[in-house]
């Protein structure tokens, strides 16, 4: 029992984080501004403070929040406060900006301490989105079933605030956060309005949501490690691809006795868990009975331990050989590649049928064309159209934008098993560029191409980056070169999915 208590208890040193005094430090807000932690920064230009955050304003604001009878009480959030010259929404955003920076300090320090160890070289590659696909190639081809679960969103902000009680010890910071949420977000019901979230700092909401998700994942990993025949090794830190700073192997005050009677339900030595944003994926080699037990475990865990309503329909179970997993811009499935081997023993020869399982990654061409259609590069059928909003730009800028989008898509989808869909996307972008230029010069597409020649826009058909790299290694006439071109290539430098359009 002592062994489980050591595993379950939080590290005491991590709970001695008194964050409330940092709210009154002006350099916290300067740090948020200088490092660009929030794109929609708020500046206070009155009272002679200049374009900067002032700790004096923060002190006055917090003191004013504690008073029951405030000087100004307005039913309309758009009315300005004559004391500061800004509305109440700006106050909530100001507190959120500072608090978002402050609560991330303990995680940043812990991440720095881990980076000084020997595991940092192994963890760097986990920052790339593509790092998950080599793992899928190695593991998923041997598995049978996959469970997809949409993580339910907290229906009340109090759940998100309570998720921080394991990381932040002083109650003043939590009370201030709770008060600002209820005071300025105007939460009158258990269902959070979308408008209330939009006025609050999205970075802080993202941090609170990831803290809540990390808590239930820690319980899941604990049960998985205790039930598995082959204990998985818990790493000190796991770099989330985009949003979260770290995952720690310790979890909150959960008692082992509550779970030990149920561990026998989940015996499975081959089980893998992946989460990205709001989706969790659980893959198993065992029978459908076991994966169904995990399904009801997820639903019960969310409802009874985290008070989140989750319907069983949000958790789907599929067989990998008959289902394509829509994940991170790829349709992944397990494909059987049949092969026939001729064997001869003495004078007798016979044929042996052998099927090899491989991971097949394809581009979701329909959804990708839908994204291009929303960005006004083509219609819903995939026919290229002009981009009128870019027609006022210089020709070089128009070509550069289209070429950059084409190369970004080619770079990200370089791991596709079939490249024909990618060639169709390049075709759409190329002729959308031509139609945009023809629209600008008030000409037809045929006349415009005839005037500039066939060498125009050759950037769209130049060799890709991976082809250029391998051309420096292998001779052009080498036979293996063609196989290399058709192979999947995963890059470990992609840390985010680039938007199709960077400029409006």
Curated annotation (Swiss-Prot):
The keyword RNA-binding applies. GO terms for molecular function: RNA binding. It comes from the Eukaryota. Signal peptide: none annotated. Coiled coil: none annotated. Its main location: plastid. Keywords: Chloroplast, mRNA processing, Plastid, RNA-binding, tRNA processing. GO terms for cellular component: chloroplast. One of its GO terms (biological process) is tRNA processing. Pfam families: Intron_maturas2, MatK_N. The keyword tRNA processing applies. InterPro entries: Domain_X, Maturase_MatK, Maturase_MatK_N. It is found in: Plastid, Chloroplast. Belongs to the intron maturase 2 family. MatK subfamily. HAMAP family: MatK (MF_01390). Usually encoded in the trnK tRNA gene intron. Probably assists in splicing its own and other chloroplast group II introns. This is Maturase K.
């Amino acid at each position: 029992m002592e062994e489980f208590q050591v595993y379950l208890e939080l590290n005491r040193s991590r709970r001695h984080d008194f964050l409330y005094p940092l709210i009154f430090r002006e350099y916290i807000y300067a740090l948020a501004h200088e490092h660009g932690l929030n794109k929609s920064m708020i500046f206070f230009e009155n009272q002679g403070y200049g374009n900067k955050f002032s700790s004096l304003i923060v002190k006055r604001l917090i003191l004013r929040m504690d008073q029951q009878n405030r000087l100004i009480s307005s039913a309309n959030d758009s009315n300005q406060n004559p004391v500061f010259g800004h509305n109440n929404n700006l106050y909530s955003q100001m507190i959120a900006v500072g608090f978002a920076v402050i609560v991330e300090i303990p995680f940043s320090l812990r991440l720095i301490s881990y980076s000084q160890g020997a595991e940092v070289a192994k963890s760097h590659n986990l920052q790339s989105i593509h790092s998950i696909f080599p793992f899928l190639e190695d593991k998923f081809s041997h598995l049978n079933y996959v469970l997809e679960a949409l993580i339910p969103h907290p229906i009340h902000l109090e759940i998100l605030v309570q998720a921080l009680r394991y990381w932040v010890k002083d109650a003043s910071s939590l009370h201030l956060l709770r008060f600002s949420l209820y005071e300025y977000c105007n939460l009158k019901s258990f269902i959070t309005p979308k408008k209330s979230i939009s006025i609050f700092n999205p970075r802080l909401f993202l941090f609170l949501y990831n803290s809540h998700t990390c808590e239930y994942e820690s319980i899941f990993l604990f049960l998985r490690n205790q039930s598995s025949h082959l204990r998985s090794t818990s790493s000190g830190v796991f770099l989330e691809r985009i949003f979260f700073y770290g995952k720690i192997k310790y979890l909150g005050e959960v008692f082992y006795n509550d779970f030990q009677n149920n561990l026998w339900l989940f015996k499975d030595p081959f089980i893998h868990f992946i989460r990205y944003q709001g989706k969790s994926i659980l893959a198993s080699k065992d029978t459908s009975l076991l994966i169904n037990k995990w399904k009801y475990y997820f639903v019960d865990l969310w409802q009874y331990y985290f008070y989140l309503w989750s319907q069983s329909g949000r958790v789907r179970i599929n067989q990998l050989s008959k289902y394509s997993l829509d994940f991170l811009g790829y349709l992944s499935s397990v494909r059987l590649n049949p092969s026939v081997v001729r064997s001869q023993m003495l004078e007798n020869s016979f044929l042996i049928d052998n099927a090899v399982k491989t991971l097949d990654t394809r581009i979701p061409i329909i959804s990708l064309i839908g994204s291009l259609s929303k960005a006004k590069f083509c219609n819903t059928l995939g026919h290229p159209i002009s981009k009128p909003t870019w027609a006022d730009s210089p020709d070089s800028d128009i070509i550069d934008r289209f070429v950059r989008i084409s190369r970004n898509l080619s770079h990200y989808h370089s791991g596709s098993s079939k490249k024909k869909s990618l060639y169709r996307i390049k075709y759409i972008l190329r002729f959308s560029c031509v139609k945009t230029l023809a629209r600008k010069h008030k000409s037809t597409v045929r006349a415009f191409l005839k005037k500039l020649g066939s060498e125009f826009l050759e950037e769209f058909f130049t060799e890709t980056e991976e082809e250029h790299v391998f051309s420096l290694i292998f001779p052009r006439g080498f036979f293996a070169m063609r196989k290399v071109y058709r192979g999947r290539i995963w890059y470990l430098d992609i840390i985010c999915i680039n938007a199709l359009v960077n400029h409006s």
